[in-house]
From Swiss-Prot:
Enzyme Commission (EC) number: 6.3.4.3
Keywords: ATP-binding, Ligase, Nucleotide-binding, One-carbon metabolism
Naturally occurring in which organism (per UniProt): Chloroflexus aurantiacus (strain ATCC 29366 / DSM 635 / J-10-fl)
Reaction(s) catalysed by this chain's protein: (6S)-5,6,7,8-tetrahydrofolate + formate + ATP = (6R)-10-formyltetrahydrofolate + ADP + phosphate
Name of this chain's protein: Formate--tetrahydrofolate ligase
Coiled-coil region: none
NCBIfam families, A to Z: PRK13505.1
Amino acid sequence: MKTSLQIAAEARLEPIAAIAERLGLPVRYLEPYGRYRGKIDLTFLDDYHDRPLGRYVLVSAITPTPLGEGKTTTAIGLAMALNRIGKRAAVTLRQSSLGPVFGIKGGGAGGGYSQIVPLVESILHLNGDIHAVSQAHNQLAALTDNSWYHGNPLDIDPDRIEIRRVVDVNDRFLRQVMIGLGGKQNGFPRQTGFDISVASELMAILAMVNGVGARAALRDLRSRIGRMVVAFRRDGTPITAEDVRGAGAATVLMREALKPNLMQTIENTPALIHAGPFANIAQGNSSILADLIALRCADYVVTEAGFGVDIGAEKFFNLKCRASGLWPDVAVIVATIRALKAHSGKYDIVAGKPLPPALLHENPDDVISGGANLRRQIENLHQFKVPVIVALNAYPEDTPAEIDAVAHIATTAGAAGMAVSNVYAAGSAGGVDLARLVIEIAERPGPRPVQFLYPLEWSLADKITTIAHRIYGAAAVTFSPTAAAQLAALEDAGFGNLPICMAKTHLSLSHDPALRGAPEGFTFPIREVRLSAGAGFILPIAGTTVTMPGLGAHPAAHQIDIDDEGNIVGLF
C-alpha cells in the first residue's frame, strides 16, 4: 500500500468554496487562504443561530499504545462514510502540533485513504493559529517579567511567576532554564522553563471560547485572557494578564486564530480544524466554536477527543460540554486487536521499533485478557449516560476469531453494537457499516440525559478523587505537600468551583504507563496543581507527566527531507 503522503499527493481536491457549499456554509462567510484552505467568519453564528443542530458524534478510544490506534483516522472515515450513504456530515478536529509531527506519533491528520488534505499544509503551520498562540503567550510572559523589572509595581513574587515561555517543538532541554543572566541590563536571574505551545493556557482558552456570534466570541476570548493568572504577589494574591496590561495585546494577536479553519478530507468531506490542546496535559478537544458552526450546517458532526476515554472523553464531557451546553447523541470507542493484546501485559509495543512478531499471530485469549481495558472504557462512557458503539479499526492480520472476541467483549460490556472499520485501506467504503450503526443508535427516539461526573460545588480534592476513583479505577489519591498547599490556596482565592483537567499519562488508565489493562488497587499521586483561570479549570499533575515532551532516539525528523522538485519525503 502507498504511504499516506503518496496517497495525499494523488488526492483530487476541490476548491475550498466548493467544500463550504458541501458543508452548507454560505460562501460569504468563507475567508480563503489559497485554493484549498480557509477560515470561517464567526458572523455565521449570528446570522444562523436559529438553525437546528445536527447530530453530534464523539469518537474516543481505548487506552492507546505508543503508536496510536487510529482514532483520528476513524473519525475522518466515519464522516466520509456518513456522506457516502446520504447524510451531510463534517468532522471537527484539533490542529496538529509540530512537536509530534517531528517527534514520533504523527500529525493527527488521519492516514491512508482517510485523512485531511492537503496533508502537508494541514500539519505544517496550517493558517498560523499555533504561531499566534505562541506569540501571544510569550508576549504575556515578557510583559510579566517586564513589570517585575521596572520597579515591580504589582509586587510580583519572583518565585511565583507562573507563566513560562512556549515553543512548538519537542525539546526536553528547555524544561528548566535560567533567564536574566549577564547583568541587570538583561533582567534579573530566575529559574523558569518552556512548555510546548499546545500546552499553553491560551490554546486551552481558544478551544473553550463560546458565544452566539462573532462579538460574543471575541468578548469571551478577551475576558478569558484577562483572567489568566500569570504570577502571584508576595501576599499570595493572584496577578492576571489584565493586571500586567497584556490581555488586549494578546487578544489582538489571537483575533484571526479565533476563526475555525476549513479543510477537506481525501473524499472532499468538510473538516473544521481548530485549536490543538494536548489531551494528556490540557483538555484535548477541538474548539467549541468549530462544533457550533458544523452543527448548524451538517446533519452529523463527528468530533474526536484525544487519547483514551479516560483522558479526552472525560474532559469532553466535564469541561467542553459543560461550557458549550452541547451533548453527544452517541459515542464511538476505537479499538484495535493489537492494542487489546498489548493490554494483556504479554507484549511490549515500543515507538520506533518493530512490533513483536508474536503480536501478529492469532490469539483470541489474549484479546479477551486485554479486553478489560475496553470494558472499563465502555463503563466510563456509560457514566455519562451516552450510548456507546465500538469501532474495531481493522488490520490485515486480524482473524475472525479475534474479531469475534472483540464483539463479545463489547456486547457483554453493554455497548450498543460493534462494527469493523477499514477506512484506512478503503476510505468511506470501509466505514459504511460503522456509519449505519451510528445512524441507527443516534436516531433512536428517547431522552438524552445530561450527566456530569461531579457537581462544581464539590471541593477540588473531592472532584479529583472522583475522577481517579470512578474513571481510572484508583483505590486512593495522595496529594504531595506542595499539591495540598496549592489546593488550599486555590480554594481560599475563590477558585474552588472550577472543574478539573487532569494531566496524566495517556498510556495507562493509571498514572503509571507500565500498568496496562484495567488496573485496580493503585494509589493515584498528585504532585502539583496549576490554575488555568482563563480556560476555566484546575490542572492537577499526576506522576511524571511533563508539559514539554522530549524527542526519542530516532525522531521522525530524521526521515523528513525534500527532493530537488520540492516534494516532501518521509513525512508519513
